[in-house]
Amino acid sequence: MTNIRKSHPLMKIINNAFIDLPAPSNISSWWNFGSLLGICLILQILTGLFLAMHYTSDTTTAFSSVTHICRDVNYGWVIRYLHANGASMFFICLFIHVGRGLYYGSYMFLETWNIGVVLLFTVMATAFMGYVLPWGQMSFWGATVITNLLSAIPYIGTDLVEWIWGGFSVDKATLTRFFAFHFILPFIITALAAVHLLFLHETGSNNPTGISSDMDKIPFHPYYTIKDILGALFMMLILLILVLFSPDLLGDPDNYTPANPLNTPPHIKPEWYFLFAYAILRSIPNKLGGVLALVASILILILMPMLHTSKQRGMMFRPLSQCLFWMLVADLITLTWIGGQPVEHPFIIIGQLASILYFLIILVLMPITSIIENNLLKW
């Protein structure tokens, strides 16, 4: 008799994806982050669901309802801070996951990579809308500033902004629709993640060497299920330390002040995970130019397979490219720092240099370095 997990139509799908899946025998801990992202997504949907039971998406009561969750709902503060800091963990895992893809040449799986870029955009949109919901000062002004960027689009810009706002400013209609979108998008993300996985399982996983591992596979369970559980425990430990010891470490104190359209905060800035893109946006004096640079900073990922000039897939045996990769990481950390600083000297010039370096490394230096390394192989 055949095992039920191999014969049952539904169990068969799960079996082929998580149990009997042939996986390379040498994938390192950098491959843990896909499963961690799945765990983050489930955590966010569950905590978000319980928050939505008590939240009201009305400008007059939104802020009070969040306060009510923290003060009066049983363990409401845990749910709220798990959700807020869970988003930070989500983005940490996302950035590492994308970084791993860049380092080891995983972008050569075109369909998987492109769906991944779409996922990144969708998660960023969801996080932005979620930040608006508590209706604090930074929620309101963040929403105003970011949605206003669309007015830079020629001809249709102003109409587009007012259409998104549902009026002539960020108000009740905006908050209600942002809540609706924030609720539905995680389910769209789940569907996209399933497609992401589907395309990945068509080709099989990449591995640190970048060489085909068809001749050396091991079953996903128990080897990588155990490895993923260990990674998940580490992540939950960090998340719980954040939630239970310093839940507001990554937040903005301004968001504990109710939204006031008549009073602009001195420094409007998004959550930490958007600061690198915000710094690129601010480093260009022209509004439309800034918006284009902002979009390009993420969309540039789609170009990665076309910019790949090396004969080797990953960077494991390419020391020059490794140096450039870590320069890029340092540059992104610098941009994140600059995004949180006021617009004044010396931060303006540092931001502009870091923005130029970001595009220069990806578009020019990396492809040229790969060609140099190809020639060094001949010696």
Swiss-Prot record:
Miscellaneous comment text of the record: Heme 1 (or BL or b562) is low-potential and absorbs at about 562 nm, and heme 2 (or BH or b566) is high-potential and absorbs at about 566 nm.
List, alphabetically, the Pfam families matched. Answer: Cytochrom_B_C, Cytochrome_B
Indicate where this protein resides in the cell.
Mitochondrion inner membrane
Which residue windows are transmembrane per the record?
Answer: 33-53, 77-98, 113-133, 178-198, 226-246, 288-308, 320-340, 347-367
> Topologically, how does it sit relative to the membrane?
Multi-pass membrane protein
Q: Which UniProt keywords apply?
A: Electron transport, Heme, Iron, Membrane, Metal-binding, Mitochondrion, Mitochondrion inner membrane, Respiratory chain, Transmembrane, Transmembrane helix, Transport, Ubiquinone
Q: What does this protein do, in the record's words?
A: Component of the ubiquinol-cytochrome c reductase complex (complex III or cytochrome b-c1 complex) that is part of the mitochondrial respiratory chain. The b-c1 complex mediates electron transfer from ubiquinol to cytochrome c. Contributes to the generation of a proton gradient across the mitochondrial membrane that is then used for ATP synthesis.
The molecular function terms in GO held by this entry are: metal ion binding; ubiquinol-cytochrome-c reductase activity
Specify the superkingdom: Eukaryota
User: Quaternary structure?
Assistant: The cytochrome bc1 complex contains 11 subunits: 3 respiratory subunits (MT-CYB, CYC1 and UQCRFS1), 2 core proteins (UQCRC1 and UQCRC2) and 6 low-molecular weight proteins (UQCRH/QCR6, UQCRB/QCR7, UQCRQ/QCR8, UQCR10/QCR9, UQCR11/QCR10 and a cleavage product of UQCRFS1). This cytochrome bc1 complex then forms a dimer.
The outcome of changing residue 123 to I is: In strain: Ryukyu wild boar 6
Q: Would you tell me the protein name for this molecule?
A: Cytochrome b
Entry keyword annotation includes Zinc-finger: no
Name the CDD domains on file.
cytochrome_b_C, Cytochrome_b_N
Question: Record-annotated residues binding heme b b566?
Answer: 97, 196
The coding gene here is MT-CYB
